[in-house]
Amino acid sequence: MREVGCPEEDLFSFLSSKRREDLGYRNILSSMCTPPHPVAARAHAMFLETNLGDPGLFPGTAALEDLLVRRLGTLMHLPDAGGYATSGGTESNIQAFRIAKKLKSAKSPNVVVPASSHFSFTKACDILGLEMRTVPLDAGFRMETEAVDGLIDHNTVALVGVVGTTEYGMVDPISRLSEIALDRNVFLHVDAAFGGMVVPFLDRPVPFDFSLPGVSSISVDPHKMGMSTIPAGCLLTRSAEWFSCLNVDTPYLTVKRECTLAGTRPGASVAAAIAVLEYLGMDGMRAVVAGCMENCRRLIEGMETLGYPRAVTPDVNVATFSCERAPVGWRVSTTRNGHMRIVCMPHVTRDVVEQFLVDMGDTDA
């Protein structure tokens, strides 16, 4: 640390130089995050100093968190769902596994997850001492449900399905997983960190939420397709009472018990998340999602015209191709199977898609 402070002008000159080293979102096609909606940025700035870890000091901000949980719970067909605002899918998935493990006594606990699951589940298993049992995928990169039953035993504390897989944008057959969960009395966690803010706004949404009786918990991230500021996730549970098993004593705060993983929690991103939902409403979110899906279809059409076939037809706005390289200046990612992966987020507009296709064509020339 400096002995003598830095002049403000010099400081912000330094910070500006570092910010210029960051990439601009226009040419980022690999991220599941996107620039925040203007109302999100405005709301975030209003609540910069708030701390949801001590809600008695910030009752208005705490009320916004409650409202966010109600709005997302209603979207997931359970208005009185339990829940709280997390830092994102990783925290939500860890907390879901914590609940599942505490709700079922198992000598050697294990969890059953699809091969497409996010790496946060590996972290969760390491932290909680859980054996991870992996379900293979079918030809469409969805969970092979016929293999699930044989992996579940009396030590299985949780089963996971994914809505909007990170690599291929697929939705696992959650309806079937719900049936299995009920039949085998297993906690079913749905990782909808990405797809949770996509599928409900599609023309023909597939069931994946609390409308299915076997679904126990859902993770959803407003800082992805919800266009909130980072970090903004949410864990929802069928029963609010389940969170009590995570409670610890907090005698020196304005609340005496706390179930969250983080202690200090930002209220600003919660305000940002609810601001977007309230400002856009269902109609506005449908329009955003429809635009992203249409741009994804156009990208697939254009890439196939150039000779790069899709790896699979996605359920949400993630496109993958048999292609080894991207044009200079564009950032895409590669799946574990070697497919080019592009996420058609709100910042990936039609103009961006068309320019990428032009550049892809020039690369082949």
Swiss-Prot record:
Q: Does the keyword NADP apply?
A: no
| E.C. number(s) listed in UniProt | 4.1.1.11, 4.1.1.25
- UniProt entry keywords in alphabetical sequence: Decarboxylase, Lyase, Pyridoxal phosphate
Q: Which cofactor does it need?
A: pyridoxal 5'-phosphate
Q: Where are the transmembrane segments?
A: none
Provide the GO MF annotations for this entry.
aspartate 1-decarboxylase activity; pyridoxal phosphate binding; tyrosine decarboxylase activity
Q: Which residues carry this modification: N6-(pyridoxal phosphate)lysine?
A: 224
Under catalytic activity, the entry for this protein gives: L-tyrosine + H(+) = tyramine + CO2; L-aspartate + H(+) = beta-alanine + CO2
- Pathway of this protein? Cofactor biosynthesis; methanofuran biosynthesis; Cofactor biosynthesis; coenzyme A biosynthesis
The record's Gene Ontology biological-process terms are: carboxylic acid metabolic process; coenzyme A biosynthetic process; methanofuran biosynthetic process
Q: What role is this protein assigned?
A: Catalyzes the decarboxylation of L-tyrosine to produce tyramine for methanofuran biosynthesis. Can also catalyze the decarboxylation of L-aspartate to produce beta-alanine for coenzyme A (CoA) biosynthesis.
Q: Which family does it belong to?
A: Belongs to the group II decarboxylase family. MfnA subfamily.
PANTHER family to which the protein is assigned, alphabetical: PTHR42735, SPHINGOSINE-1-PHOSPHATE LYASE 1
Q: Kindly provide the name given to this protein in its UniProt entry.
A: Probable L-tyrosine/L-aspartate decarboxylase
Question: What is the primary gene name for this protein?
Answer: mfnA
